[in-house]
Amino acid sequence: MRDQDLLRQIRDERWIAELLVQFDFDLRRAENGPVEAVRLPDGGALEMIAGDASGGAFLLAGPPADNRPVVYAGSEGEGGLIAADLRTALALVVGLPSLHDATSMPIGDGAALREWLAFADDEIREDWPELDDDRARLRDALGLPEPAGLLAGLHAAAADERYRPVSELGDVYEPMTS
């Protein structure tokens, strides 16, 4: 499915859009654009499609195409590529406690990071007991892959300098990963 078809499905099926807000992916936040105007290092365009509660922006990169890379631009000046397409980006958003948690430490062999993410999920479940059921509902409705194996891809994507947002003043955003 093309990115635009996926976005249309989210907009058309209100329960999906509302549930994605709980996962900190809110299409309504795109109405006002990102906290500051950003572009790709090569001058390429970034189109905001959603935002998160911290003021961060999810942006499609480059010229219109069936599937476009997804860049995250955080409100604290951190950002970068998170996925090759919207479906993979949504799998990360839905399947992980947060992108910030998933990029908070080096991936290494992945064991320490997976342990940290499991702890974060347990904390979330204390206030949101339906977390796993809601994840399954969204994966099924949107045809999202399981997040297993996506962590390494997220870390590799975030290291790609070609997608690091640049402000209007020419300031390059900090990497998302440590």
Regions found by a protein language model. Give the residues of each.
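Compact, glycine/acidic-enriched structural inserts
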Residues: 71-115
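A surface-exposed partner-binding patch
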Residues: 1-77, 124-178
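Hydrophobic alpha-helical interaction segments
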Residues: 100-141
